[in-house]
Every structure is written in C-alpha cells, then in structure tokens.
Amino acid sequence: MTLTPEDRTIILDSIRDIPDFPKPGIVFKDITTLLNNPKALSTLMDHLTERYLGYDLDYIAGIDARGFIFGSILADRLGVGFVPVRKKGKLPYTTVAEKYSLEYGFDEVEIHIDAFGENGCCSTGERSKVLLIDDLIATGGTAKAAANLIDKVGAHCVEACFIMELGFLNSKEGFSAPVYSVLEID
C-alpha cells in the first residue's frame, strides 16, 4: 500500500517538534503525540499492516525502546512473534551482542540467542524471516547493529522499517537489508 498524501499528513502532523532537545540545534521528533492520537496511530499501523501482509514474516524485531511499541502492535496485527532488541545488560537469558559506534565511543545491543528459534530457524527448519522496526533512523548505527544481530543468530532480516528517516544523514548506506521509511524528513 502506498501512503496517500492525506495519510502522510495525518501521521506527520501528529508528531511534535521539540527544538533544542536534547541539545541546542537539534529538533527532536516526539512520537508521544502520535501514540496518543488514535486516528494517526491507526492510520500508520493500517499502512504498515497492509505493506507487510504478503511478506510471510515469522517475527518482528523492535529496537529499544520505541521500536517495541510499533513492533508489538504490528506483530499482533500480523499474527507473528515479537522480539525485543535491547541495550546490553537488559535481557535475562543467554544473549548475542553487537557493538556499534557512537560519536564518542561504542554501545551494544543484544537479543536472546534463541529469539528466532533454534539456530534462527522457524518450525519448518527454514531461516526465520524477520522485520526490524524502530521509530527513527538517524545515523543508522543502532539499526545496522540490530540487523547484523538477526543474521548472526541465523535468521534473515528481510527489511528494516522506520517511521521516520532523517534523509540528510544518508543512514541507509551500508545497510545489510532493504530499508523502508514511512516518512522521510529533510
């Protein structure tokens, strides 16, 4: 399903801009106003549901923390499992981690080693098909690390989906999976 101009406006207008947050010169895109707007949230989720119905997915993986919101709603609508991609040290079972670069240092994300089935395979024995989702892609470091994690445990990241993309940062470059962004922000 292609997002209509009207639907795009409904979603975009529900996202609040917070100037100079978290530091001067940054305009933060606040999705809490999208989440508490039933029409905008439903419009967004209807679009994503229609887009991914034919993908024959096994799981949705949501990036900590806002990816959990959109990912769990979409997983429920598609009748597939949901897997949280967490910051290091937040999961209780055996995990696999992936390091990524920050402006000044490194961070890590992790998933349970059996998050997508034994050796990343679903009940048919084939590699689990996973959609990665988050609210925003800026530089892409966290998302690329999450996509690498999915592949590292033997599953297949079929696409990475973002509600918003800061297009001027060229974040899709070097991504191991196709990338879809609902809204491209310049």
Curated annotation (Swiss-Prot):
SUPFAM superfamilies: PRTase-like
Tagged with keyword Coiled coil: no
Pathway per the UniProt entry: Purine metabolism; AMP biosynthesis via salvage pathway; AMP from adenine: step 1/1
Keywords: Cytoplasm, Glycosyltransferase, Purine salvage, Transferase
Catalytic reaction list: AMP + diphosphate = 5-phospho-alpha-D-ribose 1-diphosphate + adenine
Pfam family, one: Pribosyltran
Class of enzymatic activity (EC top level): transferase
Main location as per UniProt: cytoplasm
GO BP term (any one): adenine salvage
Protein localization: Cytoplasm
GO CC annotation, single: cytoplasm
Domain of life assignment: Bacteria
Annotated GO MF terms: adenine binding; adenine phosphoribosyltransferase activity; AMP binding
E.C. number(s) listed in UniProt: 2.4.2.7
Known partners and oligomeric status: Homodimer.
Protein family membership: Belongs to the purine/pyrimidine phosphoribosyltransferase family.
Role of this protein: Catalyzes a salvage reaction resulting in the formation of AMP, that is energically less costly than de novo synthesis.
Name used for this protein in its record: Adenine phosphoribosyltransferase
Organism: Sulfurovum sp. (strain NBC37-1)
